[in-house]
């Protein structure tokens, strides 16, 4: 389905906001085309695109290269249970203070606050090791030592992966895999 989504090219932040205002409620998502800095210095910036998306309840994800001069990034309506990063929560607070949030964006925040997805990454962002992982690491001292020595970004990657498990069995599997990888001093699941 992602590949079938429309590519949209806008030249600046106001044009992107206009597109979102017009289409946020009806579009399943789009690939937003970005110019690379070397090609067009006065381009739409990623941070600006994300902020405008948040204003309408949308979020960014996958990036793909188009050419030497352009790339695309997937923007879609935020799912009700999608998690909120610390950075996006800070952006939303600032945008709300500046009175730039639109009703759809405010509704997405209200939904997230009501269902708990607004806070679901707080422990991950704070690098708090959950009890199940702490106990499993304690049983394998080399894994515990390696995990503790990992850079914050590496630990956060593992903690996020574990926190996103939907079923207890999946979470237990991810905890075991994290311990096994940490014992091998693998700083990432993709190493």
Feature map (PLM): residue ranges:
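Charge-dense, helix-prone N-terminal extensions
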Residues: 1-191
């Amino acid at each position: 389905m992602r590949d079938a989504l429309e590519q949209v090219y806008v030249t600046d932040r106001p044009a992107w906001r206009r597109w979102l205002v017009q289409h946020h409620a009806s579009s399943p998502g789009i690939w937003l085309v970005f110019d690379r800095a070397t090609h067009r210095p006065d381009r739409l910036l990623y941070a600006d695109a994300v902020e405008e998306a948040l204003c309408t309840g949308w979020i960014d994800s996958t990036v793909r290269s188009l050419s030497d001069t352009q790339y695309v990034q997937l923007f879609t309506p935020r799912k009700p249970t999608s998690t909120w990063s610390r950075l996006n929560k800070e952006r939303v607070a600032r945008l709300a203070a500046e009175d730039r949030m639109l009703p759809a964006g405010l509704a997405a925040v209200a939904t997230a606050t009501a269902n708990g997805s607004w806070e679901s990454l707080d422990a991950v962002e704070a690098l708090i090791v959950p009890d199940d992982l702490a106990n499993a690491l304690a049983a394998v001292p080399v894994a515990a030592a390696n995990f503790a020595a990992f850079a914050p970004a590496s630990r956060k990657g593992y903690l996020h992966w574990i926190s996103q498990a939907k079923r207890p069995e999946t979470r237990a599997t991810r905890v075991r895999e994290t311990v096994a990888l940490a014992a091998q001093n693998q700083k990432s699941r993709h190493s």
